[in-house]
Amino acid sequence: MRGNNVNLKTVSGSAVELSEVAFGREFNEALVHQVVTAYLAGGRQGTRAQKSRAEVSGGGKKPFRQKGTGRARAGSIRSPIWVGGGKTFAARPQDWSQKVNRKMYRGAMQCILAELVRQDRLVLVEEFAVAAPKTKELLAKLNDLNAARALIVTDAVDENLYLAARNLPHVDVVDATAIDPVSLIAFDKVVMSVAAAKKIEVELG
């Protein structure tokens, strides 16, 4: 299977051959779901914490006698049903990360890239750059590609491109080595230079 290629075309019409392993794999929904879920879970901070009745300061003395007051009996002013009391099921810091091995991660990335190709959401260009860090210039280029909400993948960091895209809420620029499954599926289109595609092919092929 490693010898097979997928034939794609750039916007200008040039033919590009890419590895079928990286850009032509059959979609595995369960695998992609597991990897994306694990990726999102790994981004959770997990530092929330609350105090139980045992941890809230005070409340050691019985607030009033057991009988004769007409009130419901109480043993502590830090009971969860009292204002200022502890939390019944106090939250604890938690590590939400999930283990995903390298083979699964690579497989999910291959599935996502192949699905982008099948859905015509992957836009290949010879190169993608702007002469100056101007948002207006970048927006015009994206509109020409019908890609207003796009992830731009380049083979190297382009300072002008990064600065031009910084003010656009639905546009992001990443290096080919920094793509992740969530970013690939979050945008309507993925605008990718041929050089970036070749770099990804080496990484995933």
From Swiss-Prot:
This is Large ribosomal subunit protein uL4. Keywords: Ribonucleoprotein, Ribosomal protein, RNA-binding, rRNA-binding. It comes from the Bacteria. Belongs to the universal ribosomal protein uL4 family. One of its GO terms (molecular function) is rRNA binding. Part of the 50S ribosomal subunit. Gene3D superfamilies: 3.40.1370.10. InterPro entries: Ribosomal_uL4 (IPR002136), Ribosomal_uL4-like (IPR013005), Ribosomal_uL4_dom_sf (IPR023574). It comes from Acinetobacter baylyi (strain ATCC 33305 / BD413 / ADP1). One of the primary rRNA binding proteins, this protein initially binds near the 5'-end of the 23S rRNA. It is important during the early stages of 50S assembly. It makes multiple contacts with different domains of the 23S rRNA in the assembled 50S subunit and ribosome. Forms part of the polypeptide exit tunnel. One of its GO terms (cellular component) is ribosome. GO terms for biological process: translation. Residues 47-70 are annotated as: Disordered.
